[in-house]
Amino acid sequence: MLLDAGPQFPAIGVGSFARHHHHSAAAAAAAAAEMQDRELSLAAAQNGFVDSAAAHMGAFKLNPGAHELSPGQSSAFTSQGPGAYPGSAAAAAAAAALGPHAAHVGSYSGPPFNSTRDFLFRSRGFGDSAPGGGQHGLFGPGAGGLHHAHSDAQGHLLFPGLPEQHGPHGSQNVLNGQMRLGLPGEVFGRSEQYRQVASPRTDPYSAAQLHNQYGPMNMNMGMNMAAAAAHHHHHHHHHPGAFFRYMRQQCIKQELICKWIDPEQLSNPKKSCNKTFSTMHELVTHVSVEHVGGPEQSNHVCFWEECPREGKPFKAKYKLVNHIRVHTGEKPFPCPFPGCGKVFARSENLKIHKRTHTGEKPFQCEFEGCDRRFANSSDRKKHMHVHTSDKPYLCKMCDKSYTHPSSLRKHMKVHESSPQGSESSPAASSGYESSTPPGLVSPSAEPQSSSNLSPAAAAAAAAAAAAAAAVSAVHRGGGSGSGGAGGGSGGGSGSGGGGGGAGGGGGGSSGGGSGTAGGHSGLSSNFNEWYV
């Protein structure tokens, strides 16, 4: 429980602990025993980071009865009146408990504290080195190597969450997010095991500056190092970057496998060599020495697995060596121009490529009057077809031919856009219908001849023609011309049959007129469908 300053210490004045030495020897021995018990209890409480008030008071054993002050004895604490600071009585009792060592505590004028833990953590007496080499307070003798004397304005920051007043040297109890507990074995405890705690202070011993000055440091013990190694194994070895690196290595090994099949094998099917190599140089050397052989070989055949040559021999060994680069992927001829980065399997291809950088065009057109020049002979050969009218590049889908392969490629795009090719008429083949209605087609367009028709058929044809003319005239807004058109057509059809035919033609004309009057309503619906 927390102690109240009112009933226990009615008046505590400002003074020094220097006159505390007049106590009796028995009181000094009792105070020393209490001091040792408090330090042992404090060390035990530190292992739990002193998280509860009960553990605080149990560790420090603040009992004013054992530390009675004489009426004339003064303390290092200024009286603030009853109830000014709840922890002032406990702080005074703790300071009085130090006995002859209170000279290291000094005066205190900082902000008020809410608990005894706050006072003990902020007090300068804990963690400082004694002049004689003895050390007292929160940190034991094993921790003296990292703690030095501080100025009067300094304090210790044991937990990153607590604010701290520090001087030019800062606190050295926290290193890279870890704090020194002062226990045997140089144990470093981390307030949060796997998360970096952002401290509000800026001092020369921050984590970033320690990393920059000393490189990555592992300040933990063996058990912490093992935990860190296990954490690294679970969180870093399965990173996607490591996976892709592993897959890339496997792909490289897969490409550097010798697939040469020994023709002298007796087994069937024959197996390939399947030796794996780490570098291209090792693979090429193996194939050249073990399989291709030296100049004594007279048969230059490629026996690489699934080779498209299918046992067809080369005339010279160097041609076989150049061919094997197709299988191995070797390209030993890089472009020497900076920034290009292209590599080639054949030296002649590199020679041609370098002309793109130099602009050299040594191959001139051999046709008289043409001054075209080319970087390689194959381009010149393609150009020569323009002068000879030779068109060796034929289209496989039609009968057209071209002098240059680029022209053929452009032509092939036409077939790709219209696979069916050219058609005779869109209306006949593509399903398109004519814009002219079937009933409006002129009789002259019919395949049958009007001279071979009977008078009745001629009259019917005249009536149909009159109806068509009438509909067209109505469509143009000329209603009066429909009858004349019908009469003219009727007279024309009747002229082939003499007088009787003329009468029939007249009837046809009148019939055509009636057909115009009667069929107009029937054709109007068709117009609405065709011309909307």
Swiss-Prot record:
The modification Phosphoserine is found at residues 191, 199. GO terms for molecular function: chromatin DNA binding; DNA binding; DNA-binding transcription factor activity; DNA-binding transcription factor activity, RNA polymerase II-specific; RNA polymerase II cis-regulatory region sequence-specific DNA binding; zinc ion binding. Gene3D superfamilies: Classic Zinc Finger. InterPro entries: GLI-like (IPR043359), Znf-C2H2_ZIC1-5/GLI1-3-like (IPR056436), Znf_C2H2_sf (IPR036236), Znf_C2H2_type (IPR013087), Znf_ZIC (IPR041643). GO terms for cellular component: cytoplasm; nuclear body; nucleoplasm; nucleus. It holds the Pfam family zf-C2H2_15. Keywords: Activator, Cytoplasm, Developmental protein, Differentiation, Disease variant, DNA-binding, Holoprosencephaly, Isopeptide bond, Metal-binding, Neurogenesis, Nucleus, Phosphoprotein, Repeat, Repressor, Transcription, Transcription regulation, Ubl conjugation, Zinc, Zinc-finger. Residues 476-521 have a biased composition (Gly residues). Residues 406-452, 475-532 are annotated as: Disordered. One of its GO terms (biological process) is negative regulation of DNA-templated transcription. The keyword Translocase does not apply. The keyword Nucleus applies. Residues 100-255 are annotated as: Necessary for interaction with MDFIC and transcriptional activation or repression. Residues 523-532 have a biased composition (Polar residues). Residues 417-435 have a biased composition (Low complexity). The C2H2-type 3, 4 and 5 zinc finger domains are necessary for transcription activation. It is linked to Holoprosencephaly 5: A structural anomaly of the brain, in which the developing forebrain fails to correctly separate into right and left hemispheres. Holoprosencephaly is genetically heterogeneous and associated with several distinct facies and phenotypic variability. PANTHER family: GLIS FAMILY ZINC FINGER 2 (PTHR45718:SF8), TRANSCRIPTIONAL ACTIVATOR CUBITUS INTERRUPTUS (PTHR45718). Acts as a transcriptional activator or repressor. Plays important roles in the early stage of organogenesis of the CNS. Activates the transcription of the serotonin transporter SERT in uncrossed ipsilateral retinal ganglion cells (iRGCs) to refine eye-specific projections in primary visual targets. Its transcriptional activity is repressed by MDFIC. Involved in the formation of the ipsilateral retinal projection at the optic chiasm midline. Drives the expression of EPHB1 on ipsilaterally projecting growth cones. Binds to the minimal GLI-consensus sequence 5'-TGGGTGGTC-3'. Belongs to the GLI C2H2-type zinc-finger protein family. Interacts with RNF180. Interacts (via the C2H2-type domains 3, 4 and 5) with MDFIC (via the C2H2-type domains 3, 4 and 5); the interaction reduces its transcriptional activity. Interacts with GLI1 and GLI2. Interacts (via C2H2-type domain 3) with DHX9. This is Zinc finger protein ZIC 2. The lineage of its organism: Eukaryota, Metazoa, Chordata, Craniata, Vertebrata.
